[in-house]
């Protein structure tokens, strides 16, 4: 039975990764709105820590490396930040599985999902924004200046993901839990 469970989880992980990449490409022309993060989090929440991390790393690598708007392979520190962030998102979903993967979703769960969406996106945005000035050797004041110059863009991304997590995850979890 163990091999059957492993195969089932492999297929589910592949489906989550494919969904994350497809939704990433489908929405890439809409600024500040993306569904990769929520799909990776759901993979961790549904399949556990290891599979969530695998889905996060694989889906972000495929999305970034093959992005028609510009491949992340051109700048290794950026793609490393993107992949690391999504691995962490999958890990977070998996580690919170015992607490949040329940059929009965309360208002506290909804708030927690929204908060997690905001915080995980903040981490992603921070790591990706800081990847360039740090790798390019900017000094600390220049690095802070570059980081602050992107806050308008990143805060909208964080708010939109907070809303997406709060609205979307409860609807999905009640069918998967």
Residue locations for each model-derived region?
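Hydrophobic transmembrane alpha-helices of multi-pass, membrane-embedded glycosylation machinery
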Residues: 38-40, 61-62, 171-173
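Hydrophobic alpha-helical transmembrane segments
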Residues: 10-15, 38, 53-57, 79-84, ...
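Hydrophobic transmembrane alpha-helices
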Residues: 1-54
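Short glycine/serine/threonine-biased micro-segments
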Residues: 22, 42, 46, 50, ...
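Membrane-embedded alpha-helical hairpins and interfacial helices in multi-pass inner-membrane proteins
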Residues: 29, 34, 71-77, 97-177
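Small-residue faces within membrane-embedded alpha-helices
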Residues: 13, 17, 21, 52, ...
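Interfacial aromatic-anchored transmembrane helix boundaries in multi-pass membrane proteins
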Residues: 21-35, 58-99
């Amino acid at each position: 039975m163990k091999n059957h469970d492993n195969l089932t989880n492999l297929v589910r992980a592949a489906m989550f990764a494919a969904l994350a990449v497809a939704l990433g490409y489908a929405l890439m022309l809409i600024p500040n709105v993306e569904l990769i993060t929520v799909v990776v989090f759901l993979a961790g929440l549904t399949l556990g820590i290891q599979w969530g991390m695998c889905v996060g790393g694989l889906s972000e690598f495929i999305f970034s490396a093959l992005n028609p708007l510009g491949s992340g392979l051109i700048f290794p520190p950026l793609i490393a930040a993107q992949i690391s962030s999504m691995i962490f998102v999958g890990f977070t979903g998996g580690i919170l599985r015992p607490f949040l993967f329940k059929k009965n979703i309360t208002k506290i769960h909804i708030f927690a999902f929204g908060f997690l969406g905001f915080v995980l996106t903040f981490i992603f945005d921070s790591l990706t924004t800081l990847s360039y000035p740090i790798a390019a050797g900017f000094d600390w004041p220049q690095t802070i200046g570059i980081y602050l110059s992107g806050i308008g863009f990143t805060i909208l991304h964080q708010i939109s993901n907070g809303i997406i997590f709060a609205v979307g995850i409860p609807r999905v979890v009640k069918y998967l839990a």
